A protein has these predicted regions:
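Non-catalytic, solvent-exposed segments at the cell envelope interface
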Residues: 1-208
Length: 208
């Protein structure tokens, strides 16, 4: 009975794979683009609540063809189809739907939704400003650098609040040189996606 009950509950969810690619990050051995962002999104079909889980890009996994490598290499090997096979093979999932975005797509989505309000640390502001230069060049979109506040004793403390445009929020997602390293980077990515989902729910149909 417990198994039947669990299966009944799980049918109320749809699971998607989300990939973020950087066209500059070519896998020279495989010839394609690595997916440096890999997120599994589980959507409650009734409430539309979204749960997100990140797969760290350097995780050693079976790419789905009995070849073991870093998880981000599956996309370079066979694009989204191979990356989904990798997730299904290693995590016992049955994902068939996915979305892939690059810098330009993400900045456009965020700008169309009017930007995002973000709580940040001093360290995040510094790194985001640095990444913005490159993100702006890649997308052709403008931004205004955030003026640094006085340096606090704890540069990792989240104590500043800013409204970010698409270039800034995308650059925020790229940060991986704070004390939390890649764990912090994936957490920031999930935070941005949750904000996008929340704003999309409340936006008019034209914006969605």
């Amino acid at each position: 009975d417990s198994i039947d009950s669990q299966e009944s509950t799980l049918t109320g969810y749809t699971t998607y794979a989300l990939f973020g690619i950087d066209h500059r990050d070519k896998n020279t051995a495989l010839g394609g683009e690595n997916s440096d962002t890999i997120i599994i999104a589980s959507v409650n079909n009734d409430t539309k609540d979204v749960k997100l889980v990140s797969v760290y890009r350097d995780t050693l996994l079976n790419l789905g063809n009995d070849t073991y490598s870093k998880a981000n290499a599956a996309y370079a090997y066979g694009e989204a189809e191979q990356a989904i096979t990798m997730l299904n093979t290693n995590l016992d999932l049955n994902i068939s739907e996915y979305a892939t975005v690059n810098f330009n797509a993400l900045t456009t989505i965020i700008d169309d939704l009017g930007g995002l309000d973000m709580d940040m640390s001093y360290a995040e502001i510094v790194h985001m400003n640095n990444y913005c230069v490159e993100t702006s060049e890649e997308t052709g979109k403008d931004y205004t650098p955030i003026e640094l506040p006085d340096r606090p004793d704890d540069i990792e403390a989240v104590q500043y609040h800013y409204h970010l445009n698409g270039v800034q929020a995308t650059s925020y997602c790229r940060i991986r040189y704070t004390a939390s390293l890649d764990m912090g980077r994936t957490e920031r990515q999930r935070r941005v996606i949750q904000m996008i989902v929340s704003k999309a729910k409340s936006a008019g149909l034209g914006k969605i």
